[in-house]
Structure formats: structure tokens, C-alpha cells
């Protein structure tokens, strides 16, 4: 087994017992793949499929003029290069986007002959399309955003009922709904009287037969579509019907049924059963004589014409009178509809009878009246409206998904055409579609078939970034189309080009609106790598076209059987969004139709294969799926007599031969965040939910520390999140410093004609969206060999390429003087001293100089009425120095604003300009450090409007950036030269010279000779071998090209820096100051474990006072044991024990290293740990002695262990490891009180738990106010920290003071401390003078009350 660079350094022992069938997939694929398919950027225009952007263009173009003489056709689109890269966009506050150009063809036809008269082709600029970064995010206006995927109801047809809630009788009313991808909804529904109604777009209901009439069917045709006929014969005064025994089953016999010999088969009043049916068939009965009463209330199936020409219409109810008419009219035979009360209800016939419309025209008018109330209906308007509703591809689109679901639900073949034409035809409804839906609805009402479960994942699909952007793009294009159509008629006469016709602004506006302000375009949660990944893998049922929090019921939010392996049953927010926002399971992916799929191994005849098949919830119906941990022998046969399986959403046991599939992994059920919780299987689900949510709030600590007890998913998350630097190609580390890594690439991975050098620039101390610090640290050394995919540098919260959200803490579960009451946490001062829970937060503060009506604001160090001391940290331009340590109230950027007292005349302006009387007419509006903030300035950026002169500081920053870039490029070229020189020496070594350079013809080129020459001289040598001479020429050409490319890069960078910045209107200059704030842990900060065990730090004790063991090792944290039993998250106890074993083993390894034991002894001990305690076996023999020593050195702090979710370490294994580490098998330790040295009464559970510091820091929440801003109307202090507000003294607090009888305190609260304007000014003066006298006046809110009463017309004094 081959280990990667980081794995060699620190192998994580895995306790998993199940074989790894497939690796966890790339975790961001749902975002990246979706947008890639949308853009199809890498493909040539000819090879582009009809999806994404291409489909959007194809669906709107060609655009024809109203006359049909001019048309615009779409040819192809191309995306340019973005102007700035991702980092520059974040810095400048711009959008990372590429310009899009579309080739459009204008065709003009001759008016008379309609032949093509003119064709013009032109590229049209269509605005910018935001590009996705490598990590699945978008940079919009300088901030990283994520487009969350939406889980919405799939288009198609759905049958449902109201569960008896609509009508007071409790009768179940059935309904059907056809939902298109875009267009009008069509609903059919029953009412309490069993008539069928139709609604279009949820408007007023009409009888369903109105729509059938509008489709062109008459009464007879409608009845034929829904009912079978029964012929009735009139023979010698009695009626006979054809006997179909099967139809009679279940009915009550209304008369005796006899055979041909008169023997009674069924007596009157008895129910006809299967035995009776068999007897009738045996007796050979073909006709049945029926009394007249039997035919009463039956329905005629067609128009019946009597002898005298009178017509009895179809759908007439038979009665005595009608029967007499038929007999007199000489009708010998007629058809009635086959209906009964059991499974052939007469619903459609009854509806048709209630329908007052007589023909198609009337039906269309009825529909028009509902859709356009108040407008006078005309025949054409009604016809057009109805056709446009469901039969026009412009207005209605079922989409391939909708058509597939529709056909599948109605039991038709569901292959969907892929070409544009068939997609248009299948996208609209046909007459048969509407009739089949109605027929199925009636069948369900008759008791055949089931209603749909709308929460089934086969009826909900995922709309990802690409699809949502495509929809927005289409919206923009349709707006363009409207405008273009009107202009096209001009194009025929005015000789216009495509550029003149198309205005791309609506497209750009639609895209901008979507990315900037859509509910699903969210500010990325960038607390740590896990929160980024989780945010990108989120699926939301909210958003446009989705649910709203208020309307979503319990069923939608609940866990559904189809969530298994597709959506995580654990990870969802607490609060109003619970169950509406979910996370994808680890192995889940969306298929082409947008349905979530999960992988399974195929099982054939009880034998498990390694073939993996992805199944959606629709395809999973009917399969029998065994669990991942089912017992299997070495040949893959299921060994149990009855296997525990899932079938039709139920957990049952079945014999192995019936099993069709098997889970690929035990982690398949849960999401990424939940799969990072060790011993998840021992935690209550509610606590696991809190645990997975709180891991996302963990703040990256100063030094990341890998978890001793992990799950094995840590490396996957760190790699896929994109925060680490990963080697694109293998090679040797040529150069490394804190901000750059250079790799000389392996020969076999190089592309012909390149120097084979990869340069990786690291991100240093950058601000994240949540103000945490993003910083990358190198983990490779000079000369190290790395392979493709190896981790070169750690990002925030990663340690050796593994996710490391918190710190391993030595915890004791015991009480300590009430300091861990109610989940409080007692910390040791050692944690503070070692900076283990210290984090760096970076704040961005902006100062904007605007052009005001009174003149321009100015950024300057010349500020009126400010002392020298306050300006000591500013430079001549008035901007703070980098490295300055600042506290609350310090000036960061000096800015003065013109005062608005007097409007100056031009003469006065001139005098002021000459004599510089600044102080009089400007006020200080400098940027100061906000209250409660203290930190170090780490960066300053100055942006100046294009056309304005840059100040000294801006020029200095620009120069520094250019110098740094020039240095980078020089070093880059130097590395290329070095690499080229080595290659040249390698090529020339041992060759014969043909002269050139300092060599003579026939010289043998030795290594000593060559290594003494410079590259220039080397390249002048002409070797005898022509192939090598050719190679040298190639290298020379390459270096020239590289040099030119570097010069070009530098010129481009210089141009970018020299041009002014695009600032919003009225803004002249923006200065951004970045403050780094160091936050140590302190009482009031929130901490948590990974099992939902959260608490607030109550006290930080000196190390010497903490409880310690017999060896004098103090604990870091004391937790309350009462926090475990009632919460049922026992996983934390198992983690603590296993953590103790991991640390104990690390201590033993450290002891061995100190005693300088032999490598062989080390190998043996490591072998015991990795290969003798169960779990996955490690190939330690493949490591060299040096690598074993390096590995042992990295294991000193503890041996990292992985206990995968649902496949983790067993109790016996934990005990074995504890024993191997020479620790008691109970996991409990005798502790002593640090203050008295006395032993505690009983042994205490002590071990190592991974604790996180959450982004709920007391520094951000603590806030105090004496005086400040007041509300305009009520004059009461504002609320909240952001407004520098006060604490609300509400109604209940007033009651408390009343209860104590504290009258003066109460008066003070309600007047001078609140809204008594004069009183508070007076008391402020008094306190300043040292006189604490209070003189309360009238509160302003009382004045407001009197004003409101007066506004009602009641005078009050």
C-alpha cells in the first residue's frame, strides 16, 4: 500500500472493519459539475450539447419579426478572459466574471418572394457571466458567495387527496395536478358531491368537462373516453342485457338471477361473489333478463333517435317516462354506460350533466372569463388564450424531467427525446395527456391505484447552480426578445446590424440580480473548511418556486425513507428552518434529471459484487437492499440465513437470494459534518444534530491540532475544501519559504517544450467572510520528493492535510465547586499560556471620501482640533502605518468633510483657497477604531477614482506591490533558468562538441567543464548529435518565450495598478484598513465537543489549582458529569477513553525515543498498535527506517485514531489499547485536589476529548453604554450593539421594581435614563459638576401618546 507524503509522516490507525469499496467522491462536485455543464466553456462551439447556456440561446432564438421578413439566428457564444483574477477581485470589491460574446446572424428576406436577400453575421457583447472559482464559489462585488441548490417539487403529474380535511363530512376528496417546469398549473379535483372540477393556475374552479369540450370533444365522445358500454335489448316487452359475470361481482342482486332452466343462482338481496360468478359461467348464461327498475337511473351512452325523429340525448338518466318513450319509439336496442357504486362511479357523466356549456366555443369563453375576468371575450381571444396555456412551447414547457415523470406515472414508455424538436413537442401537453390524467384520477377515486407521496425523493428534484443560472439567463433573453422583435421591422428598411438590434442590458441585469440578491445566493459561511463544504453541499426547500417557512408543514420537514443515502437525516438547522434546509449525504449525487442518487453494490444470487450502481429514489422502488455490515464470506457470498434488508421503505429480514443490492459504506447515510463525529452511533440524534451544526461554527485556532480520535473523513474534507495547497504534478521541492513553494516537475509529467517548474503562492493572513483568519503554512521541506495530489501547505484549521477544528484537551468528568453547573466549563490557565484556544480575527474597516454638495471630502493628516498624540500613528497622507498597535478610539484614517453652515460665494471660496482657512469650514469625520476593539494594523489598501491623482501612500503601496511582483517574476525566471541549465548539462554530458562557446571541435564535454559555464555559454555549444542540438534550440526558444511572457505579465500588472479603480458614483477615494485582533479564550466564550456537548467557560483556574493525577499531570478542562446521562450522547465518553489510549501510546513512543531505543523496537511497538488491535492493517514494512523515525516523532503527542461512523472501535478494542498504553482498562483515574493535595472520593473518568472554540465570543457580545443615540420619535435609547444602544427595561422589569417598592429607581429608569430629554441633559451636567441631584421631567413617549390621541380628534391637555 502506497502512502502519500503526509500519510507517511502520520498514519491514522483505522478501526473500520468493512472493506472500502469506493472512495468518498469529490465533495464539491454538485456545484462544480453543474456550473461546468452550464458554461461548456472548454468545448468547441460545434461540440456543445443542448444544455445550459446553449439551450437558453436555442430556446429563444431564432427571433422573427412580426412580418416574418427578418430573423435573428444564434450561431455560437464565446467567453473571454476575466480582467482580474480571484484574489484581485476580492481586494478590489469587483465581480469575478468573464465577458460573453455571441455570434448572431441577421437574415433579411425579400418581401414578395420570401427568398433570402441579405445575411449579416456579427459578434455581439452580451454582458458578463460570473465565473465559478476552483472551490465552487462566486466572487460578487468582492465577497465570496455560494449558490445553494434547491430541492423543489419535480415537474410532472401528481395525484393527492385532502385527508378528509376540506369538507365537514370528513369525505376524502381526490385531486390531480399537472406541474410544468414553466407555465400554468392544471388541477383536477373532486368536490363533496363527486363532481370533477378543473382549476387553471389555482383560479376559480370550472367543471372538468368544460376543458374537455374546449379540446373539441362532444358529449358522446367524452362518455366513450371514460366508460364501457352495456347493450340493452328490448325483446317482447322485457329488457335483456349482455351478461358479463365479472362485472356483477360485488354488487347486490336486485332480483333473482336464474340459469336457463329456471334454477336460482343468486337470490334477490344477496351480494354476488366469486362462486356465483363461476356458477353463471358454468351455466353458459350470455344474456340476463332484467326488470325495468334495474335500468332506472342508468345512463344512456349515445344519442338515441326515436321513430318520430325525437332524440334522447346521450348522458340522459333512464326513468319510467324515458323507458316508455323508448318502447313507443320502436327502439329495439340501445347502449347504456357501465357504472356501479363500487368501482365504476358515474362521476364524469354527472359532471357532464351539470355542465351548462353546449359546444367548444362556449367552453372557451368560460375559460377566458376565469383567466381574464372583466375583459370582454371574443372568439379569437378565447381560442388564443386556451392554446397558449398548455399547447404553446413558448409559454409552456414540461421539460424532459417533467415528461419522464408524467409518462412514468401514467404507465407509458418514458424514453425522452434529446433533440430540440422532440423536446418542444414533448414539452407541451397533448389531448391524450389531459384525458389520461383525468382517467387516472377517476380510477383512483374508484379505488384503483394509489395517491402519490409528495415528500418522496422521486417527486422532488435538485436544481443546482447551472440550472438556476440558465433559467435567469433565459428570463433576460426573453426580455431582449420582446425589444428585438419591435426593432426587427426597422432592420428590413434601415440597414441595421445585429449590434444595433440587441441591447444586452436586460440579460446582464437578470444575471446580476440573481447572483447579487436571490434568496439562494448566500454570503459564504467561511468560518472553517467544514462550514465552506457544508454550505456548498446544502439543499434548501426554500427560495423562489419553493416552500415558505410559514406554509411548510410537519410532513415536508420530516425524515423520509427515501432520504437514506441521499439526504442526511441528522444535519439540519434548529429553529424555523428545521427540515427545510438539508445536507447531501457523503456519497449522494444528482443525476441528469436532477434526482438524488446513491451508490449500491450489485448483489447477484446472494453474491456481493464490486459493481457499483447509482440508484435514484424512483429506481430504488422494488429493490431489496442489504446493509453495509451484512456478514459476507471471502468469496462475497452473504452468509446469514436471513439478511437484514430495506424493502419498500421497511426494514425486514429476507433470504440472501432475494437481495438485489447492498450499501457501499456505513457512512452512506450521513452528511460530511455528521461523518466527522466519532461514535456517532452512540449519540442521541438531537445531540448529533447540534454537534454537526457546531462543528461549522468552530473558529480556526492559532495552531491547528489534529483530532486524536477522528473518523477518517478529516483528510477528505481538508483536501476537497480547497484550503490546502495540493501538488498538481509530482517532483522535487526546489525552493520553499513562508509564502511560496517551487517544485521541479518529474520528467514523465512534463509537457514537451516547457521548463517543468510549478510555483505555488500561498495565502497569508487574509480575512474570511466571518472575519476569521485565512493563512496557509508550508509543511514540506527543501529537497522533499512529492507526488501528484500530495498536500504541500496547510490552510486554516488543517494539520498535515487533515481537518483540525479544535484542540485535544485532557478532560475530567467531575464537579468542581459549582464552576461547571448548568454545562459551564472550567478551564486550566495552561490552555491560555500555551495559546491553544487563541484565534486571530481580521477586521476590515473602510473610510470613504465622497464628493458632497459642499465640496469634496479629503483624506489628510491635517485634522482640526486633534492633538499630536492622536496623529502619531498616521503618515503624511493621513493613513495609519502598517504594524501600528491601535485601541478603541484611535484614528486610522484622517478625513475632513466640508461643513454645511454657509454656502460660500465663489469669491469667498477663492479667498479661502488662497489663505487656507481650513479649520473654520471643515469637520473631523475620521475613521476611528470601533469601541471594544484593539489590534494591530496588518494591511492598508487605497483605491482612487480613475482620473484623480493618487496620494503618496497609494503610490507607495503600488510601488511595493510592483516590486514584490517583479521579485516574484525574477525568481520565477531564475528557477526556469536553473532548471534549463540542469537539463542542458544533462543533455551535453558525455557528448562531443562541434565547437561554439568556449569549446573546440571534437572536445569531449565533461560534467566538470559544463558545470563551470553559465547558461548563455552552454547554449552556444554546438553538440555533434543533431537530436541534442535540436533539443538545445527548443530550450533556447522556450527561455526566450518565457522571458517575453514575464515582461508581458509585468507590463500587464503595471497597467492594472496604474489605472484608477471603478468606484461607485460620488466616491473619490476608499481606504481599507485591516486590523488583526488576537482573541484568547476567556470566561463567557462558548466551547463545545463534537457530540452536541456545548457550554460556556465559567472560570480559568491557575494550573496549580486544577485536579491532577498521581503523576502530577493536571487536567485541562473539568466538565459536569450530569451533562451526559440525560442528553444521551455517550459518544463523548467513548471518545474520552479512546483519546486517553491514543495519548498514552504517544507518551510511550516519546519515552522510547528519549531512551533512544532501536528502530526495530519502534517498528515492533508500532506494529502492535496498528496491526494487532483489530481494524485496518497498515503496511509499516514499506517505510524506511528514517520514515519510521519521522513517523514516531510525529506520534509523540498521541497516535491519531479513526473510528468511522457506524463501523467504529468496539469496547474491547478500546480496552486493549488502554492496556497497551499501560492505562487502567476502566479508563478512570484517581485525582487529587490541586489546592489541598487531597484525593477525591472516587476515581474519575479522565481522558482526551476534542474541544472546539465556537464563533460566539464574549468580546463580540459584551457591550456597555452611558449616553448615545436616541430614537427620533420616542426619544428612547436605541437597542443593540451595532447601534451602540442601551438595555431594554421592559414591562416585566417595571413590575419587579414596583414589587420592591423602589419608586425612585423606577422613576429614574422611566425618565432621565430613557426619554425625558431635558431631564437627561440636566442630570448629565449635574454629574459632571459632581452634583448627583435628579430633576425628572415629562417623558417624550407621553407627549407622543397625547399627539396620537389628538390625531384621533380628541383634545387632551
Swiss-Prot record:
UniProt name for this protein: DNA-directed RNA polymerase subunit beta
Catalysed reaction equations from the record: RNA(n) + a ribonucleoside 5'-triphosphate = RNA(n+1) + diphosphate
Enzyme class per UniProt: transferase
Species: Acinetobacter baumannii (strain ATCC 17978 / DSM 105126 / CIP 53.77 / LMG 1025 / NCDC KC755 / 5377)
Listed transmembrane segments: none
Cross-referenced PROSITE patterns: RNA_POL_BETA (PS01166)
Pfam family, one: RNA_pol_Rpb2_7
EC number: 2.7.7.6
Keywords: DNA-directed RNA polymerase, Nucleotidyltransferase, Transcription, Transferase
Record SUPFAM superfamilies: beta and beta-prime subunits of DNA dependent RNA-polymerase
Family recorded in the similarity comment: Belongs to the RNA polymerase beta chain family.
Chain's gene name: rpoB
One record GO biological process: DNA-templated transcription
Self-association and partners: The RNAP catalytic core consists of 2 alpha, 1 beta, 1 beta' and 1 omega subunit. When a sigma factor is associated with the core the holoenzyme is formed, which can initiate transcription.
GO cellular component: DNA-directed RNA polymerase complex
